[in-house]
Amino acid sequence: MSELLINDYTRKGFVDGLCLRLPTICIRPGKPNKATSSFVSSIIREPLHGETSICPVAEKMAFSFIKFLGKKKEEWALAITGYVVSIPIVLPILIIFIKAILDLGK
């Protein structure tokens, strides 16, 4: 709702707005569903059920993508996305989750 309001007010020139979408992790019960589940929730859900989980994203992949974009590309990114920017999950935080789960399993 607030995103629509900010976009509309920005379009009309009332404000110079920008919306940031923060990533959330919602662990759903039951088996993963391709439409609603992500690998991040699987990394937390499967170990809770005593199952093995696999992280399909390499640690270097996110950093190489950021390096590919380069510095000072904010204007280019805003031109493509408009006034809504989805912030990607921070990979080091995901690695901390994985290490904590592995430590609990020892």
UniProtKB/Swiss-Prot annotation:
Keyword terms: Membrane, Transmembrane, Transmembrane helix
Compartmental location: Membrane
InterPro entries hit by this protein: Glcn_transporter
Pfam family, one: GntP_permease
GO molecular function: gluconate transmembrane transporter activity
Membrane topology: Single-pass membrane protein
Regions crossing the membrane: 78-98
Positions of disulphide bridges: none
Main location: membrane
One GO CC term on file: membrane
Name of the protein in question: Uncharacterized protein HI_0094
